[in-house]
Every structure is written in structure tokens, then in C-alpha cells.
């Protein structure tokens, strides 16, 4: 079954990845000369076992290729670097089988190759600037523990991603970011992004840069506070606010601004000699301040246990829950059954066989997929295989 799905996908992309593999083995040699080449291939084999729109299988693939150029090591100016990120996605849709709103898989996208990021960063003591085509979620609204999981909501939470067009996977846009390190614990980061980077149909390769007043702009501000012990971070708390300026029409009424606020917390519960081992927990909370947005509020949280078994100290396992609550407007317009929420429960375990090779079995149970009572609760399972260098 999976073989047939794979053969219908962009097989040549996978073969091209294999062709590049030998060059990856010598990428570290370039780092001393100011150029770092890194990459990863992620393969998901997934099945919707029960419920949802339909039972069936899906194959999803993701190739990341990144290039970092250090201006000082290359013989130019100090404190600068250029970053280029090439991205390819291939396969088919898992959410089409499930019918969920939050998107169960964080690498799901249309099959295509794109220039995902291209930006310049400059550092001046406690201030850092970034300008260019940039992924908002590489800086803002990040939970380090939540990144362990596969559901999209644990990456970029849906009170942002589902409510506005902005610069996130799989399509980034132009942006400018300034980050100020106030002290060793507190940091303030501000940014402005293109208010409409396009869609996977209108801008499939992320090469169409268009800035005009009709696109509006996306502003985001985030305070980040770290609690450290012996120079090691044990807790991080983030408070963010965003404002999307773009004219939208609802029920014949023109609305321009869309705002939201969020909080994220990461904390290590166990204080072991090896700081990479033990239990860490995370929480995400977000609210939309615009009554016309689809998502009114979001809550997510969970835990990850690193080094559960003494004979597999690099493995990790965890459980997480993502709960999105829909606005009255969305329910009145799009939810015939007036369901108020969708919830995803995820269980994941990661086998680390070597530094670059990881195998991650994953199970998710989706309650009220797409807020539609005609779609039964869904149970899906997948295995993620990833190789990085």
C-alpha cells in the first residue's frame, strides 16, 4: 500500500536527496571556512485506523536543506550571517482522511519545492536584527518541549495559524525582526511581517514577493523570561501579543484589525546531573481578540520524559493534548452541528539509534474532527523516520 503511494509521489526528489547524501558527510569541513551545510529527511507512514472521513493510509515526506554563511569567517564584516533554507514536501494528505481542523501532522503540505527562508542577521552586543524571508515560528511562539510532538498545534498554535495569514510553514514571507537582550534572563523580540505571503497555490515556490497596502502587515511582540541555575535554563516563560492589519469583510461589514495574545511555559521538573535527562512539561494558552476569527481560544500542554530506560538513555516519550475552541461566528457560519471545540490527544515515543537516525511511533485520537458530528472521532497511527546531518 505504502509502496504504491510512494511511487505516485515526487520520487525524483527522494532520489535527488540520496544523490546529495555523500556531500553531507563532508559538510562539517566547510564550517571552519564560514559555510555550514545541514539537512534532514523526514518520512511519515500513517494510517487512519478508525473514524474520521475515511480509513486509509498516507505517506508524507519532508526534505530540509540549510546553508549558513558566516560573514567574518568568509573574510567580510563581523557579527553577520546569511541563511538559506530550501524545503521540499511530497506525499499526500493525512488530514483529508481524518477531517480535522488542527492538522495532525506538522509536515503536511502540498507536494512542491520552495525557497523557504532567505535572510540576513546582524548582532550588536545585546541587540540582534534579522531581515528577509523568514519563518515567524522559528523565533516566536515556540515551546521547546512541545516540538517533540507531531500535531501541528504543538508547533505554531492555531489561535495564530488558523486565524490569520502569516509567515509560517509551509509558506514564509518577508519580515524584519529586532531582538533585545534586556538582561541575562529577560528578552524582548519585536517583528513585522508581510500580512499576506500568499497560498500554496498562488505562491507555490515562495518566490513571489509582493508588498502592497491591501496585504496589510502582521506585528508580533514577545517577552521571554528564563530561570537559570548554574547557567543552565530550567524554565522559560513567554508572553506574546500580535496584531494583523488586513481588510476583511464579514456579513457585509469591513473589519481591519485582528489581534491575539498568548502565553507559553516550559519547565524541567527533574534536576538530574545530566540536564538532558528527566521530565519536562509545557503549556500553551492563546486567545483571539477578534470575534470573527475561527479560533476563539486554544490550550495545549503535555510532558516529555527523556531517558525513560537506563539502557536507552537517549530515547524519549511523551503525552500531549491540544484543545481548540471555536468562535460563535465560526459556529454560526460553518458548523452545522454547533460543536464548540476540537481536541487532539497524542502519545509519542522516540527511538534514537544514532545521532542522525531517529524512529518515532505516534498515536493520536481526535475528538470532534472539524467540529462536524457526521465525522466520528478518529484514531490514527504513524511511524516517523528521520535522518539528519
PLM features: residue spans?
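Outer membrane beta-barrel transmembrane domains
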Residues: 201-210, 222-224, 240-259, 266, ...
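Outer-membrane beta-barrel "beta-signal"
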Residues: 377-389
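Short loop/turn motifs that connect adjacent beta-strands in outer-membrane beta-barrel proteins
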Residues: 27-37, 70-82, 126, 185, ...
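Transmembrane beta-strand segments of Gram-negative outer membrane beta-barrel proteins
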Residues: 30-49, 82-86, 92, 152, ...
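Membrane-embedded beta-strand positions of outer-membrane beta-barrel proteins
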Residues: 37-39, 82-86, 129-131, 178, ...
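Residue-level signature of outer-membrane beta-barrel architecture
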Residues: 30, 43, 69-75, 121-124, ...
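Outer membrane beta-barrel
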Residues: 56, 60-195, 293-297, 302, ...
Amino acid at each position: 500500500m505504502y509502496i504504491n503511494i510512494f511511487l505516485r509521489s515526487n520520487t525524483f526528489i527522494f532520489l535527488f536527496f540520496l544523490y546529495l547524501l555523500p556531500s553531507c558527510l563532508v559538510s562539517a569541513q566547510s564550517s571552519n571556512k564560514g559555510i555550514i551545510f545541514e539537512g534532514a529527511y523526514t518520512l511519515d507512514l500513517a494510517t487512519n485506523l478508525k473514524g474520521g472521513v475515511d480509513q486509509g493510509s498516507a505517506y508524507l515526506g519532508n526534505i530540509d536543506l540549510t546553508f549558513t554563511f558566516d560573514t567574518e569567517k568568509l573574510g567580510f564584516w563581523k557579527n553577520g550571517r546569511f541563511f538559506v533554507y530550501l524545503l521540499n514536501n511530497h506525499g499526500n494528505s493525512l488530514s483529508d482522511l481524518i477531517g480535522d481542523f488542527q492538522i495532525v501532522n506538522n509536515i503536511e503540505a502540498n507536494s512542491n519545492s520552495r525557497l523557504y527562508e532567505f535572510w540576513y542577521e546582524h548582532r550588536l552586543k545585546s541587540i540582534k536584527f534579522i531581515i528577509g524571508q523568514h519563518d515567524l515560528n522559528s523565533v516566536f511562539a515556540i515551546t521547546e518541549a512541545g516540538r517533540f510532538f507531531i500535531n501541528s498545534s504543538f508547533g505554531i498554535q492555531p489561535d495564530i495559524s488558523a486565524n490569520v495569514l502569516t509567515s509560517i510553514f509551509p509558506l514564509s514571507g518577508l519580515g524584519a525582526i529586532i531582538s533585545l537582550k534586556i538582561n541575562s534572563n529577560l528578552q524582548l523580540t519585536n517583528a513585522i511581517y508581510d500580512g499576506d505571503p500568499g497560498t500554496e497555490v498562488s505562491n507555490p515556490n515562495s518566490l513571489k514577493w509582493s508588498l502592497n497596502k491591501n496585504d496589510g502587515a502582521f506585528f508580533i511582540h514577545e517577552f521571554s523570561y528564563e530561570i537559570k541555575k548554574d547557567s543552565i535554563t530550567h524554565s522559560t516563560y513567554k508572553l506574546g501579543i500580535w496584531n494583523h492589519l488586513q481588510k476583511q469583510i464579514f456579513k457585509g461589514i469591513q473589519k481591519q484589525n485582528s489581534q491575539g495574545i498568548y502565553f507559553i511555559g516550559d519547565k524541567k521538573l527533574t534536576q538530574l546531573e545530566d540536564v538532558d535527562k528527566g521530565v519536562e512539561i509545557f503549556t500553551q494558552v492563546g486567545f483571539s481578540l477578534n470575534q470573527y476569527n475561527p479560533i476563539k481560544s486554544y490550550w495545549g500542554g503535555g510532558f516529555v520524559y527523556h531517558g525513560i530506560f537506563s539502557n536507552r538513555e537517549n530515547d524519549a516519550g511523551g503525552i500531549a493534548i491540544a484543545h481548540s475552541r471555536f468562535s460563535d461566528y465560526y459556529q454560526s457560519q460553518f458548523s452545522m452541528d454547533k460543536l464548540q471545540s476540537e481536541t487532539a490527544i497524542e502519545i509519542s515515543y522516540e527511538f534514537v539509534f544514532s545521532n542522525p537516525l531517529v524512529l518515532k511511533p505516534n498515536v493520536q485520537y481526535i475528538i470532534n474532527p472539524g467540529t462536524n458530528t457526521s465525522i466520528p472521532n478518529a484514531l490514527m497511527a504513524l511511524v516517523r523516520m528521520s535522518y539528519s546531518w
